[in-house]
């Protein structure tokens, strides 16, 4: 099974379909393998219970007649539209990722359950029971929330919680731009353990925040107005920015790659917001804190 794209979060939101295929394969005495579209997806696959293994998309061989390949990109709902775009909403309405993938799964004949997340395998980390973790880093510069907002949010939360931010590497000396104690998670498995063990998570719309949601950890996602990746469950809330302006929408449309099925040799380039992320900059720490209090 190949997920909807190459990001860590793209695999996480695809998990209900992966898990349904694993359950079906087990009943039939077969195996389910993941076709990983990035190294981070391959590393996270080790935490998916029942998965037989993982193969890199770049090295994926042609399948034999008895094998079945489910490629979630190979569907008109994916190929013909950029999710969250005005054209998409005009055709389908304001669908979120669970509703989109449920339709794709149904067309593939897969009975996937999107009613609640089934957590990844994890090992508890001691000492995080009263810790709120902040997910501030993202590979997409168009999704950045200002450091001053994160520091203000951390200050408000410290009155009641231990507060740390998840980082993929340890900061060196004075190179750390954010004055919040760091919790390094050097690989996806370590991130799963930390995000499963903490009191809650407030994070930008990125892979680690999606992992927290998958682990049923109370999570507030800070996202752009048109993001479809928020998953609406009782333990989740979304703090959405203002609608994107015309320049931002045009830049996003120009960088869309939804018409590609295979991502072999695809070179993704981070998209920079031409408007300086004004939509997220207007969001206030107090708003995030209030949403988090709804989940306590």
Indicate residue ranges for each PLM-predicted region:
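Donor-binding and catalytic core of enzymes assembling or modifying cell-surface/extracellular glycoconjugates
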Residues: 146-231
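Nucleotide-sugar donor-binding patch of glycosyltransferase catalytic domains
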Residues: 213-296
């Amino acid at each position: 099974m190949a997920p909807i794209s190459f990001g860590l979060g793209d695999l996480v939101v695809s998990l209900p379909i992966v898990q349904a295929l694993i359950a079906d394969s087990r009943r039939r005495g077969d195996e389910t393998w993941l076709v990983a579209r990035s190294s981070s997806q391959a590393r996270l696959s080790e935490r998916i219970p029942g998965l037989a293994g993982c193969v890199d998309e770049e090295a994926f061989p042609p399948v034999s007649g008895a094998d079945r390949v489910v490629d979630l990109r190979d569907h008109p709902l994916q190929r013909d539209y950029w999710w969250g775009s005005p054209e998409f909403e005009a055709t389908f309405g304001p669908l979120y990722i669970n509703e989109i993938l449920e339709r794709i799964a149904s067309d593939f004949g897969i009975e996937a359950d999107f009613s609640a997340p089934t957590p990844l395998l994890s090992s508890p980390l001691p000492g995080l029971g009263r810790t709120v973790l902040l997910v501030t880093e993202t590979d997409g510069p168009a999704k950045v929330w200002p450091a001053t907002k994160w520091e203000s949010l951390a200050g408000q939360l410290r009155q009641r919680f231990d507060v740390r931010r998840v980082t993929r590497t340890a900061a060196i000396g004075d190179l750390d731009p954010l004055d919040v104690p760091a919790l390094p998670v050097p690989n996806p498995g370590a991130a799963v353990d930390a995000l499963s063990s903490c009191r809650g998570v407030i994070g930008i719309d990125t892979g680690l925040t999606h992992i927290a949601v998958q682990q049923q950890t109370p999570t507030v996602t800070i996202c752009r107005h048109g993001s479809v990746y928020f998953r609406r469950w009782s333990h989740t809330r979304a703090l959405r920015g203002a609608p994107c302006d015309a320049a931002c929408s045009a830049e996003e449309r120009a960088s869309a790659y939804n018409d590609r099925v295979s991502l072999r040799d695809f070179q993704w380039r981070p998209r920079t917001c031409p408007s300086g992320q004004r939509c997220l900059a207007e969001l206030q720490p107090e708003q995030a804190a209030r949403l988090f209090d709804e989940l306590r």
